[in-house]
Design a protein with these regions (language model features):
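Residue(s) in the substrate-gating loop at a strand-loop-helix junction
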Residues: 158
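Rossmann-fold cofactor-recognition segment
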Residues: 72-85
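Conserved glycine-rich cofactor-binding loop
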Residues: 37-38
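Active-site helix of classical SDR
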Residues: 139, 174
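SDR active-site lid
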Residues: 191-248
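Active-site-adjacent segment of SDR/Rossmann-fold oxidoreductases
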Residues: 163, 184-194
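Substrate-binding pocket helix/loop in short-chain dehydrogenase/reductase
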Residues: 115-116, 123-125
Length: 304
């Protein structure tokens, strides 16, 4: 556990790997992206399709399905990750197509904003149903196809899965759960050749905050996200997570250095809290030695 926490310090960069593009001599690898209508999911869908991969794009509304179907290399699938019937139908559609399935991007998600003391249990339950049980349901249903292709499962987490802040309690809980989901599933599926990883975005432009406010009537500093960058870098990280030859377990993607530093410093604070005043605490020299050992296993950090 200590070595793992120390190794989180290494997550501020993408590394130098390049995703392998499909060649004309082979059928394009197929990937399912959930929550593909807007935001990160839409950027991931468009990026992968443009690179020549075949994308099954999950969405719920007719207009969104039509817009996704208009993109070359994309087949829209009606998919609400809280509905088992939708999941079963998606699995049947993908199986019948005969392309197999190489990748799953668990992207569909909702945010819940506001104090825990006044948030309804129904709102907390919705957050868990979409952000936690949704990926669990879908991943379980698609495992036979992913194992057959020795594919990859990439979940869109958040830096809120590393730290937590005021008014994002339920959302942060759900994203912390996805960190554990990723690590446990990676260990379970490694013997079958399936790689599991997680992309952890910081603050990027999306509709997730506005959707939460519209649903709950609670407006917070997270509601308007239009001032943030488009999630182009997040989509690039997802492509690497899916296709680079030696993928990382975690891809932290922040819009600027300040946010990256804040996240890593918070992780260091947690490490200090974990170590302090317990029977088997380590002194500074021992902690630095652990960090040095962890750094030796990581590729060199490329500075722009």
């Amino acid at each position: 556990m200590r070595t793992f926490l120390l190794s989180v310090l290494l997550l501020g960069c993408f590394g130098s790997g390049l995703a392998a593009e499909p060649t004309s001599a082979e059928s394009p690898k197929a990937v399912l992206v959930t929550g593909a209508s807007t935001g990160i999911g839409r950027h991931v869908t468009e990026r992968l399709a443009k690179a020549g991969y075949f994308v099954y794009a999950g969405a719920r509304k007719d207009a969104d399905l039509a817009a996704l179907n208009a993109i070359p290399n994309v087949q829209a699938i009606r998919l609400d990750v809280t509905k088992q019937d939708d999941i079963d139908a998606a699995v049947a559609t993908i199986s019948k197509a005969g392309r197999g399935l190489y990748g799953l991007v668990n992207n569909a998600g909702v945010a819940s904003v506001g104090p825990m003391a006044t948030m309804s249990l129904d709102e907390i339950d919705l957050t868990m149903q979409v952000n936690v049980y949704g990926p669990v349901r879908l991943t379980r249903a698609l495992l036979p196809l992913l194992i057959e292709r020795k594919g990859r499962i990439t979940t869109i987490g958040s830096i809120s899965g590393i730290l937590a802040s005021k008014d994002l309690n339920a959302y942060a809980m759900s994203k912390h759960a996805m960190e554990a989901f990723t690590d446990s599933l990676a260990a379970e599926l490694a013997p079958q050749g399936v790689i599991v990883n997680i992309v952890e975005p910081g603050n990027f432009n999306s509709e997730i905050g506005a959707s939460a406010t519209k649903r709950t009537g609670v407006e917070t500093r997270f509601t308007d996200r239009s001032k943030y960058k488009q999630p182009v870098e997040v989509a690039a990280a997802v492509e690497l997570a899916l296709f680079e030859p030696a993928p990382k377990r975690r891809y932290m993607v922040t819009p600027d250095q300040r946010e990256a530093e804040y996240t890593i410093r918070k992780q260091i604070e947690q490490l200090v809290q974990l170590n302090e005043r317990q029977p088997y605490s380590y002194d500074r020299d021992a902690l630095v030695k652990m960090l040095d050992e962890a750094l030796k296993t990581s590729p060199p950090i490329n500075k722009p």
